[in-house]
């Protein structure tokens, strides 16, 4: 039953039997969630792909736009200039060059993100496998029914004795 061809998987070995529709539903759900997570991770990594020169160009462009707009507006409507980059960094981040910091954040952020969702799907798959292998839902229900029966049996006899004495 567990090692060999199954009707739920066409070309290959089946670990446990599930209906074809349920298998397709679970696989499509896992595929869609994985695709969505991959898109989010790709988007985040694109956001971090900025070199030091590009960020300096953007800052100088913003400063130039700010100085040109300040002269045409009244001081009460002027927007404050962007803060200096050194003010935004913590003490440890100041020691690391800006481009290396971005690459490090991108690498470890992506690594942690992908590791988390891959580990989650592997654990979900193992949980499903062992639940079906050991028939966990049926055994839990059987255990509960047996415990309830053990509790109800003495109560039933007490009730019968009480009714018989009255």
Curated annotation (Swiss-Prot):
Q: Which GO terms of the cellular component aspect does the record hold? A: host cell cytoplasm
Q: Report if keyword Ion transport is assigned.
A: no
Q: Which UniProt keywords apply?
A: Host cytoplasm, Host-virus interaction
Task: Identify the domain of life.
Answer: Viruses
Q: Where does the UniProt annotation locate this protein?
A: Host cytoplasm
Keyword Nucleotide-binding present in the record's keywords: the answer is no
The UniProt family comment states:
Belongs to the RL11 family.
Q: What does this protein do?
A: May play a role in rearrangement of cellular cytoskeleton towards an efficient viral assembly and spreading.
Q: How does it assemble?
A: Interacts with host IQGAP1.
Q: What is this protein called?
A: Protein UL5
Record organism: Human cytomegalovirus (strain AD169) (HHV-5)
State the gene name recorded for this protein. Answer: UL5
